[in-house]
Structures are given as structure tokens and as C-alpha cells.
């Protein structure tokens, strides 16, 4: 087999593009590789036309564990439902691809990116996005491409292009920038409270690299003799559009200018206008062109009515600087926030409301054993902070079956999770596993940013010592030719009929997360820069309102939350604490009714609903790991008797033996003649043998004094109530 290939090198890493070798029945297929990471990306289009007013595009990302040389767990030893990571990468492909297809296109299109080999130094997600563009172009599918994506990291003061997993973890920025020849079409970012200016510079840096990957795709197409299919809109009968414009422009415009009406009232009035038009058309004669046209396509009235509403709303913003609810372009909706709204059976709770968007967030404190184990190709093996986002149908006044979380819910949850992670306390300071659940009670735009705000409030209510509170807002855009208007805190209709949804989250210090999606074919960095800068005063305004509700962590945890103690032991003594077959640690947990977790680095975490029990377990473990020296004197308790001597517990969990010859200066016939089980005695450490066994003596030791058990100072990481 022979194929065509090209390559481009970034910071010493070569990206290779090869076509013509695999998946010959797909419209387009490309192998994209960097290091040992290899992906096969295919694009397939059917001629089936969907009777819908949207593009039926499906983007899938598949990763099999063989790509990392692993066999799946479970009885079947086969991959099952796609992991969350695969869902997020599938969304990452979809988001920059969708706006680059013609808005009139209704053919079914499916893009499948399959990770065949994974190099832990080279993340596969940005390669999948670039591969999706090239596969679509190779398949000669109408598309406003090429499009490409790169990742930018920040180590110290230096930007890094397509950093490794380790560099991402060590750095202060992880941003993915996707763009077309027209400009940027998608941004996804997490940052460690990065300034707006540094963030903008990173985006600009990333887009420069995107243009190089776009050129590489164009060169490969040229070498193959493939001409890009420029989308050309089919002829459309505009009879209905003209009729609606003539008969509906004035009534729709009046509705959009009723700034004091509610969303429900506006929706009802617009629906009434649409039904009246529908009724008028239905009353026409059967051979009337309008009636024939709408009877052949029942959704045409809805589609053209939406287009007219969109046109009028956008015109009002461009020309009058007013939005449908009467706000100025940079004005935030009314905000209310309250923490601690649920009983303390729920460890932390809060409700955040902005306009008609209302989110209830709850926080649960868990033990280290509650961490989520990751069974995918991500180098991270577990998650200790989880954010789950739920969007029930009643939040938008609808009815539908409630199923498992969909792609949108997973994506919104991941964004809110990413926004909070940079401000979470360290494991040694606060070793709890944290789960936040955000329930959207009402939705009218920017529920993901409402979830960020609700998460902050509920975490503080749970007593989590955040480094700083985080707030978020969604920025919008209306672009008509050269006229551009940036909107602050967009609501549902502005998201639906606008050109951009740009979510910005962060602290007073800087940005922690970004997510930008477009409905047009690209924007210059200058406009994106303006949006980021205008988001800051909105974020700080929201933050001020949140701090009126709760401005610091609760001083005490819920009485129903587990109590944790965390301390460090010598990693070489972990085996001593665990004991043969786990008997020692099992005995401690049963004796104290606690849960104990020990990490490879020697960090011990003890969990219990009883603070005294946790302290007792800590005392035992510290006794087990305390080094005993020859000559030390201890006051201990005789734990058992054997024919040749007695065992004495000199520290919690640590015993030594007094040989029968060391019980007294005189000869002893029977051990029981001197000591019995339960007696308290004072002993001296005579020697520690080569196997670490402690030999004790009573000879020459006064029995009315000596050292008592040491009382180590507990190291609680949360207040013990």
C-alpha cells in the first residue's frame, strides 16, 4: 500500500499526516501521528436528507486500551460504554467542526476518530480535531475549512506548543485553540488564575501555530490533486420568507421591544404570532403557492419565522444597543445567592440565581477511598474532585424521560469542575474527596457558569478552605458585517440567535477556565481579547454578590461529615503498619472503628465519624512507626504470657518480649510468679536484634516510675467536633 503524506514540526515534535492507506470506503480518511500517538480519523457522508432545521452531524472518539498495551478489566475483558474522557474529546471535535459546515446542509455526516496508539507524552485530543478537518476535506464534503487545533501550555514565563501530559500537569495553563482561515472557532482552557493579558497572548500564540497546520493540510490536498469543495447554497424559494417579513416584522419587533415582559410572556406572544400566520396560510386555497410550499415541508414556517426573529433581535442590538430584556450590552442580570439552604445531612449546599437561571449545588465530603478510579487512557489514575451537572426537563418547562447524563451534561460538568480545581486546597491540608452536584432548577442561559458560582458557595458552606472564590459569566456576540457587539451575561435567546457563547470563569486574581463556541466561521484574536477583558468586571460584580452570601469557609464541618486526620510516616515502614496479609491495619480499623488509607509516599489518612477514635488510630500507627532505642524506659502493659517470657506493649501497637531470665534478679521458675496478663510494668529496652525484634528487661528497673506512653500531638486537617 502506498499513500501520500506530509509533516510539520513544532518545538521539535513532528506531526505526520498520511492518507490513502486505510478505510477506503469512508469518504475521507487520514492517519495523524505525533511521537507514538496514532489516530485514524474518518469522515463519511450519506445522501440521506434529514427533515430537520439543524445539521445531523455525529462526532465520535474511540479509544481502546490496546492503544496503551493494556487489557480491559471486568469479566468480559472488553471495552464497554465510552468513558467520560472519550465523550469530552468527541465534543471537542464537534464544536469547531459544526460551524464550518454550511447552515443549509442536512446530509448525515459522521466523523470517527480512533486512537490506535497512545504515547503518554502526546495527548490525542488536538490531533483528533485536526484529523477531522483533513478527513472531511479529503472526502470532498462541503466545508469551510481547513481547520486545525493546537494545545498551549505555560511553564514559568514560556509558552509551550502541544505540551506533554507531564508538562500540562506542572504548568499554569492548558488551553486548546482551534481555528480556520477566518479566525478562531473554538477555545477550551483551564488555568491557574492566569491574568487576562497572559491568556490573550496564549491564544494569539496558539492561533499562529494553527495557521501552520492549515497550510500543511492545503499542501497535502494540492499534492493529491484534490480541490476543496466550496459550499454553494442551493436555490431556495423565498416566497414564505417574503410573506413573513411583510406580515410579521412589525408584531415581532413590538414583542422584542417590550423590555419589561418575562421570558414566558415573550415566548407566548411570539408563538401566538406564528400560529396566526400558520392559520392564515392554512385558510388559503389549496393551489396557492404558499400553501403548497408549507404543506410539502411542515417545518418551513417554524424555520423561516425563527430566521426573521433572529434578524430583528440582532438588528435591535446593533442599531439600538438594547437587548430583549432592556439591559445594556454590558449589564449583568439580577443576582441572588444563599448558602446553607439544606439540613447539614448534606455537608454543604447553596442556591445561585441569575435572572431566570437557577442552580442548586451540593457538596459531599468523602474519604480517600471514595476517589474515582479512572479506567481509560488518561495517565491520571484517580479523581479526588468530582462535579456532576444535571439538567432535568422541568428546568425549561418541558417533559421528557429522564435518562443517564448526555454529552451536554457531561461537558458542562467538566467545565465547572475545571474552573474550581485550581483553588482547591492541597491533599495534605484537606485530604477529603469532594463531590459537587449541580442541579439546574431553571435555565435561561449560562447554567454552566451558574454551576461554577453554586459550586463555590456550597464548598465554602461545607467548610472547604478554598484558596479563592470563583465566579463565571457567559459572553455573547452579534456580528453583522463589520459591526460587532459583545454582550455580557447572555440569556437563552441571545445564545440561540447569537454568534458566540464564550464562558469565562475565574477569581479576582485571574482566569481558571474558558470555553468558547462559535456559530460563524471564525473570529480574530482582537475580538476575543475584547470579550475576555469585558468579562472581568462582570465576574467581579458576581463575585461581590456571592461574598454577600458567604465570604469564608464555615469554621466547623457538618456533624454528619467524616472526620479525617492526615500525617506522614516513613514510607519504608508502611509494611509494618499493614502487617502480614494486612492483619495489623485490619486490627487497628476494627479496634478503633475507622477507615485508614496509606499512600505510597507515606501519607496516612484516617477517617471516622468519631474524632476520638481517629486520634486513637493515629496514636497506634505513630507507635508502630516510632523508632525504639536501646536503653529507653517505657511503662507498658503485659499483653500475653508464654512459657519463656512475657510480651509487653510499650507503645500503641508495638510489643517487646521480656525473657523469663529478665523478669527478676532472682531465678524465676514460672513467668506467672512475677507478672500476669494485664499488669502494668516498667521495662527497659535491652536490645533490638537483627530482625528488628525488641527485647526488654525488668532487671534493675524500678517499678514505681518510668516513662509512660508518649502522647503525640494529633495533626488534624479538619476541626474535630
Curated annotation (Swiss-Prot):
Its main location: cytoplasm. It is found in: Cytoplasm. SMART domains: KH (SM00322), S1 (SM00316). One of its GO terms (biological process) is RNA processing. The keyword Nucleotidyltransferase applies. The keyword Cytoplasm applies. Mg(2+) binds at residues 495, 501. Pfam families: KH_1, PNPase, RNase_PH, RNase_PH_C, S1. NCBIfam families: polynuc_phos, PRK11824.1. Involved in mRNA degradation. Catalyzes the phosphorolysis of single-stranded polyribonucleotides processively in the 3'- to 5'-direction. HAMAP family: PNPase. This is Polyribonucleotide nucleotidyltransferase.
Amino acid at each position: 500500500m502506498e499513500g501520500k503524506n506530509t509533516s510539520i514540526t513544532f518545538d521539535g515534535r513532528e506531526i505526520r499526516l498520511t492518507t490513502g492507506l486505510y478505510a477506503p470506503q469512508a469518504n475521507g480518511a487520514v492517519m495523524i501521528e505525533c511521537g507514538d500517538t496514532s489516530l485514524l480519523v474518518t469522515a463519511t457522508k450519506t445522501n440521506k436528507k434529514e427533515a430537520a432545521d439543524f445539521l445531523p452531524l455525529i462526532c465520535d472518539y474511540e479509544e481502546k486500551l490496546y492503544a496503551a498495551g493494556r487489557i480491559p478489566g471486568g469479566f468480559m475483558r472488553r471495552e464497554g460504554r465510552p468513558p467520560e474522557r472519550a465523550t469530552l474529546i468527541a465534543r471537542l471535535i464537534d464544536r469547531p467542526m459544526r460551524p464550518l459546515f454550511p447552515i443549509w446542509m442536512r446530509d448525515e455526516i459522521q466523523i470517527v476518530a480512533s486512537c490506535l496508539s497512545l504515547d503518554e507524552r502526546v495527548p490525542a485530543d488536538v490531533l483528533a480535531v485536526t484529523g477531522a478537518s483533513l478527513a472531511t476535506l479529503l472526502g470532498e464534503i462541503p466545508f469551510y475549512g481547513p481547520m486545525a487545533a493546537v494545545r498551549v501550555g505555560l511553564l514559568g514565563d514560556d509558552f509551550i506548543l502541544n505540551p506533554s501530559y507531564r508538562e500540562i500537569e506542572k504548568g499554569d495553563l492548558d488551553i486548546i485553540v482551534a481555528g480556520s482561515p477566518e479566525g478562531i472557532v473554538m477555545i477550551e482552557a483551564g488555568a491557574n488564575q492566569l491574568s487576562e493579558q497572559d491568556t490573550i497572548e496564549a491564544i494569539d500564540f496558539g492561533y499562529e501555530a494553527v495557521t501552520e497546520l492549515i497550510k500543511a493540510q492545503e499542501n497535502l490536498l494540492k499534492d493529491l490533486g484534490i480541490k476543496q469543495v466550496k459550499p454553494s447554497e442551493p436555490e431556495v424559494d423565498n416566497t414564505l420568507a417574503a410573506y413573513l417579513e411583510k406580515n410579521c416584522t412589525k408584531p415581532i419587533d413590538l414583542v422584542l421591544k417590550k423590555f419589561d415582559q418575562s421570558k414566558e410572556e415573550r415566548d407566548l406572544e411570539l408563538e401566538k404570532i406564528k400560529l396566526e400566520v400558520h392559520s392564515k396560510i392554512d385558510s388559503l386555497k389549496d393551489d396557492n403557492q404558499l400553501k403548497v410550499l408549507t404543506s410539502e415541508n411542515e417545518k418551513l414556517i417554524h424555520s423561516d419565522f425563527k430566521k426573521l426573529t433572529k434578524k430583528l433581535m440582532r438588528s435591535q442590538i446593533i442599531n439600538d444597543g438594547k437587548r430583549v430584556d432592556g439591559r445594556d450590552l454590558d449589564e449583568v442580570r439580577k443576582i441572588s445567592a444563599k448558602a446553607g439552604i439544606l439540613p447539614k445531612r448534606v455537608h454543604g449546599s447553596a442556591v445561585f440565581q441569575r435572572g431566570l437561571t437557577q442552580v442548586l449545588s451540593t457538596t459531599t465530603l468523602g474519604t480517600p477511598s471514595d476517589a474515582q478510579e479512572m479506567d481509560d487512557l488518561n495517565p491520571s489514575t484517580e479523581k479526588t474532585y468530582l462535579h456532576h451537572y444535571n439538567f432535568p426537563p422541568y428546568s425549561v418547562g418541558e417533559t421528557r424521560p429522564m435518562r443517564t447524563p448526555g454529552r451536554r451534561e457531561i461537558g458542562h460538568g467538566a467545565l465547572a469542575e475545571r474552573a474550581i480545581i485550581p483553588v482547591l486546597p492541597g491533599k495534605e491540608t484537606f485530604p477529603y474527596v469532594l463531590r459537587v452536584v449541580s442541579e439546574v432548577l431553571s435555565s435561561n442561559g449560562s447554567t454552566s457558569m451558574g454551576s461554577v458560582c453554586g459550586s463555590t458557595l456550597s464548598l465554602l458552606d461545607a467548610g472547604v478552605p478554598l484558596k479563592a472564590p470563583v465566579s463565571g459569566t457567559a459572553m455573547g456576540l452579534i456580528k453583522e458585517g463589520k459591526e460587532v457587539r459583545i454582550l455580557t451575561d447572555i440569556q437563552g435567546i441571545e445564545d440561540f440567535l447569537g454568534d458566540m457563547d464564550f464562558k469565562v470563569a475565574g477569581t479576582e486574581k485571574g482566569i481558571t477556565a474558558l470555553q468558547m463556541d462559535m456559530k460563524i466561521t471564525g473570529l480574530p484574536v482582537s475580538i476575543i481579547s475584547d470579550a475576555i477583558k469585558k468579562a472581568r468586571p462582570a465576574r467581579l460584580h458576581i463575585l461581590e454578590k456571592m461574598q454577600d452570601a458567604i465570604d469564608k469557609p464555615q469554621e466547623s464541618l457538618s456533624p454528619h461529615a467524616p472526620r479525617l486526620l492526615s500525617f506522614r510516616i516513613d514510607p519504608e515502614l508502611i509494611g509494618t503498619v499493614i502487617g502480614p496479609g494486612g492483619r495489623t491495619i485490619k486490627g487497628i480499623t476494627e479496634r478503633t472503628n475507622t477507615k485508614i488509607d496509606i499512600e505510597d509516599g507515606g501519607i496516612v489518612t484516617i477517617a471516622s465519624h468519631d474524632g476520638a477514635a481517629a486520634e486513637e488510630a493515629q496514636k497506634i500507627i505513630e507507635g508502630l512507626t516510632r523508632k525504639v532505642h536501646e536503653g529507653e524506659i517505657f511503662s507498658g502493659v503485659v499483653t500475653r504470657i508464654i512459657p519463656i517470657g512475657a510480651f509487653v506493649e510499650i507503645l500503641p501497637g508495638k510489643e517487646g518480649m521480656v525473657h523469663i531470665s529478665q523478669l527478676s534478679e532472682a531465678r524465676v521458675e514460672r513467668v506467672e510468679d512475677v507478672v500476669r496478663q494485664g499488669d502494668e510494668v516498667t521495662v527497659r529496652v535491652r536490645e533490638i536484634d537483627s530482625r528488628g525484634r525488641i527485647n526488654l528487661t525488668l532487671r534493675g528497673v524500678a517499678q514505681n516510675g518510668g516513662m509512660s506512653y508518649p502522647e503525640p500531638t494529633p495533626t488534624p486537617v479538619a476541626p474535630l467536633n
